[in-house]
């Protein structure tokens, strides 16, 4: 009975918060660059057959390539440091015990012990440096193509790498490296045409983020792979550790879900067997628009949201990628110093993607387990700040393309996360109807690069 009453109270709380948030609709394109003149990629502009597909050079897509979460936890047990080894921490930083996240491992000094204990945690590492009260924050990510446009694939890959820094409220990146694998199945012509476009997309996104690509590694491999490393040295007040959520906080999401569904559905347009399973719930035009919406969202940096985390006193955050919103919420909940749990009530989803997920019997979108690529930030904000954050991020002064929704609350609990049985689905309408029809400059040499 007590549990039911608590659930009811949570529902009322969410209704009030959503009412305070105001408009739930999308608000345009990405900051720094406009996608309004984007023209859908056509392989013919590169001298390829109309049936040419970038995604044919890999067997998996985007962040869907991640090792399943439970399997990953077991594999990473091998990184646990033996008790006799010296600790990774360097003592106290700013009068507080420093939390170190090493390659997705959270390290905190164990109770009653001089040595840190290890647990699976977040994606960035935060390493206190020996001098000057500075910390090294570093992250790496790579994946396989999930869109057909090589230039946009490069942008998405870079945005995805930077997102781990942004999830910690870091807005500046000192350096990036690019990791690139060129498919050995490609012809020489394909390599010469496609590879420079992917590199240009990656570089342009890095420059939009105020950083530069200074090196990396390029190899030949059966599948195309693209990603990189992002590094920054910063003071403690420049980042927000993801461990300070408190009861009463509100969960805010800054990009809609459904990117992986949209990417797969777009490929199913050429696969009659799979298309027949979903054609009763979605039209070809709706799939094309959803795919374009997903692509633009994935290519949008989370940098503005990272800056606003400081303005509105965020307590913790993570980015939503390969483990879906539920998996990443659970990871974030495990990091919390306080005894709290996250409860998700609302799921902003690209229009029609929930219907496709149901009709296909795949993805688990409504269950929160569908992989996302270069997804939004899930941020724990003080309740009184959440609606203001959602309003502020849509301001034209940050450029176009940013949006946010209140999706859940932080309750007293045991560091877990869950989605309620019947979450409210917020259908996010694609913004690309006019963009798809707009005339774009000649892209025969630059593929479908967005305009500046």
UniProtKB/Swiss-Prot annotation:
GO terms for molecular function: ATP binding; metal ion binding; selenide, water dikinase activity. Binds 1 Mg(2+) ion per subunit. Disulfide bonds: none annotated. It comes from the Eukaryota. It is an enzyme of class 2 (transferase). Its EC number is 2.7.9.3. Synthesizes selenophosphate from selenide and ATP. Belongs to the selenophosphate synthase 1 family. Class I subfamily. This is Selenide, water dikinase 2. It comes from Mus musculus.
